[in-house]
């Protein structure tokens, strides 16, 4: 199985890192083209385009300005250790041993508006450029047009290298829209996480994001290869709900937390 998740807005470039053998993102020429376009934006443009505060807009204008190749351990950080949102709280990459990190490097991918596809140990310079951003560019009106088939083709290559024909989508709709579903060389499984609230089960964003990270870590640490065994996921109080599930859309539910 190859797992895909969304990136996070919150970044950590401060905390101590273990000794890691890092890799380079594989689509940096594309990233460089996007950076050149983003550098044409004023902080006011960024604020309007991304719907962010002036402070965040200025920070990201500075990030675009400072972005430079080559990436090294002084100016960049391994992607899975840099992202710090809810998905990554669930993932808890710091708890992975060397074998598990190696497994993640082969089977875990982060989609990115700037970098396209990232492996856990790919070095990444700080940025904010969400996939849904309507940034017109040399290839079209937005980032979906910019990335075209590139992301899908790289995921297909990664699936082939990992000897799997199953893609587990743990990303948001905004990000997975960058994947051409009909061109994926295999089966797409899209787990759903629902929490009980006032007697009803529904997707609660904060919990669902964390659950996606929990499932990704669970798959990697167990070395799971058979997608049929995804139904055994039972972390943090979630359990498989057969009545609500289909083979390609397994549903996991958790009773209301006391």
Curated annotation (Swiss-Prot):
GO terms for cellular component: cytosol. It comes from the Bacteria. InterPro entries: YaaA. One of its GO terms (biological process) is response to hydroperoxide. Pfam families: H2O2_YaaD (PF03883). Belongs to the UPF0246 family. This is UPF0246 protein ABO_1338. It comes from Alcanivorax borkumensis (strain ATCC 700651 / DSM 11573 / NCIMB 13689 / SK2).
């Amino acid at each position: 199985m190859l797992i895909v998740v969304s990136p996070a807005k919150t970044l950590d470039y401060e905390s101590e890192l273990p000794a890691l053998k890092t890799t380079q993102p594989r689509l940096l020429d594309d990233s460089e083209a996007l950076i050149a376009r983003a550098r044409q934006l004023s902080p006011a443009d960024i604020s309007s385009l991304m719907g962010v505060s002036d402070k965040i807009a200025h920070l990201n204008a500075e990030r675009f300005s400072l972005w430079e190749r080559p990436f090294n351990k002084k100016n960049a950080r391994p992607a899975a250790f840099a992202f710090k949102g809810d998905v990554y709280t669930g993932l808890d990459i710091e708890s992975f041993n060397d074998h598990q990190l190696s497994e993640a490097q082969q089977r875990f991918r982060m989609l990115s508006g700037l970098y396209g596809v990232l492996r856990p140990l790919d070095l990444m310079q700080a940025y904010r450029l969400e996939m849904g951003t309507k940034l017109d560019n040399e290839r079209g009106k937005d980032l979906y047009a910019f990335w075209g088939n590139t992301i899908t083709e790289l995921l297909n290559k990664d699936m082939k290298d990992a000897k799997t024909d199953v893609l587990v989508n743990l990303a948001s709709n905004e990000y997975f829209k960058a994947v051409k579903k009909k061109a994926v060389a295999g089966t797409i499984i899209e787990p759903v996480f629902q929490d009980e609230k006032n007697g009803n089960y529904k997707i609660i964003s904060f919990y669902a994001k964390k659950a996606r990270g929990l499932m990704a870590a669970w798959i990697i640490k167990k070395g799971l290869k058979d997608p049929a065994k995804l139904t055994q996921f039972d972390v943090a109080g979630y359990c498989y709900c057969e009545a609500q599930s289909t083979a390609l859309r397994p549903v996991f539910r958790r009773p209301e937390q006391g």
